[in-house]
């Protein structure tokens, strides 16, 4: 059975049709695998390495379904680290049985690192590559979720609430300084939304930047938002402009190398 078929079979056991968030995660996983195939096609990888990267994509969010069942939320800070839960599920099941012990650990370690602020130190070169690939593929696909799905489900905050809030100084300065934003630094719902823009600064591959810029999902929510405070709207637009300038500058540097 193909890995995606096995994943869909596993996910279907949680889907009784009453919670649309199950479908959301299935679609997200399919999008991540599509992006992963684009990223691996742009690199000189062996067929086996492409397969391992694909498995990282298919199974990276497998912990989401049990998370939702137990805690009724996808928000890790209100429940459990879904990546670590997913690794437990993968270890207990037969999802990776066809792999060697070393390959299993490479895939599991990459999945365990996909939602961290930064990748853990000390990984071997191959595992580090898989971790970078799944982090990029996930972020590229998350922008679509952010733009198109119910923001209360995906971020915990509605557009109405966010439009009345401000961007905290630390979040604003992090975007201008090209830093990833720590969860504890976010003080408002708008901070949570703006923190998605900081994904740009953690993308590892030029192809990832091209995908995100072409999609345009990263700015869609903000362009549709009704801001109560014009100064806040200006701050958000500055954040968007800064991330775009950063991305295009990196791509120009890549072309020169």
Regions found by a protein language model. Give the residues of each.
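Acidic/His-rich, divalent-metal-binding segments that scaffold phosphate/diphosphate chemistry
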Residues: 1-84, 124
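Short coil/turn linker and secondary-structure boundary residues
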Residues: 2, 45, 99-102, 231
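Short low-complexity stretches enriched in small and charged residues
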Residues: 8-14, 64-68, 93-98, 149-156
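A broad, low-specificity signal for short, low-complexity segments enriched in glycine/proline
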Residues: 15-17, 104, 156-162
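Divalent metal-dependent phosphate-bond-processing catalytic cores, especially two-metal-ion Mg2+/Mn2+ enzymes
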Residues: 22-30, 34-46, 59, 70, ...
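Alpha-helical scaffolds flanking conserved acidic
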Residues: 46-59, 101-110, 127-133
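Hydrophobic/aromatic-rich structural module bridging two neighboring secondary-structure elements via a short loop
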Residues: 65-106, 117
């Amino acid at each position: 059975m193909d890995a995606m078929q096995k994943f869909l079979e596993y996910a279907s056991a949680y889907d009784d049709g009453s919670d649309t968030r199950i479908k959301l995660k299935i679609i997200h996983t399919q999008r991540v695998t599509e992006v992963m195939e684009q990223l691996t096609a742009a690199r000189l990888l062996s067929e086996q390495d492409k397969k391992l990267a694909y498995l990282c994509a298919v199974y990276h969010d497998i912990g989401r379904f049990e998370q939702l069942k137990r805690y009724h939320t996808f928000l890790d800070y209100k429940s459990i680290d879904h990546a670590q839960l997913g690794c437990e599920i993968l270890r207990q099941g037969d999802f990776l049985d066809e792999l060697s012990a070393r390959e299993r650990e490479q895939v599991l370690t990459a999945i365990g690192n996909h939602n961290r602020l930064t990748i853990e130190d000390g990984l071997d070169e191959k595992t580090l590559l898989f971790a970078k690939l799944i982090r990029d593929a996930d972020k590229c696909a998350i922008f679509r979720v952010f733009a198109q799905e119910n923001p209360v489900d995906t971020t915990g905050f509605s557009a109405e609430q966010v439009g009345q809030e401000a961007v905290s100084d630390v979040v604003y300065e992090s975007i201008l300084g090209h830093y990833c934003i720590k969860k504890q630094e976010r003080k408002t719902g708008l901070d949570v939304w703006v923190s998605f823009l900081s994904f740009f600064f953690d993308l590892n591959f030029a192809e990832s930047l091209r995908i995100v810029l072409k999609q345009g999902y990263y700015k869609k929510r903000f362009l549709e938002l009704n801001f109560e405070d014009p100064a806040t709207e200006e701050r958000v637009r500055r954040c968007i402009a800064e991330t775009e300038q950063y991305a295009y500058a990196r791509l120009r540097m890549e072309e020169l190398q």
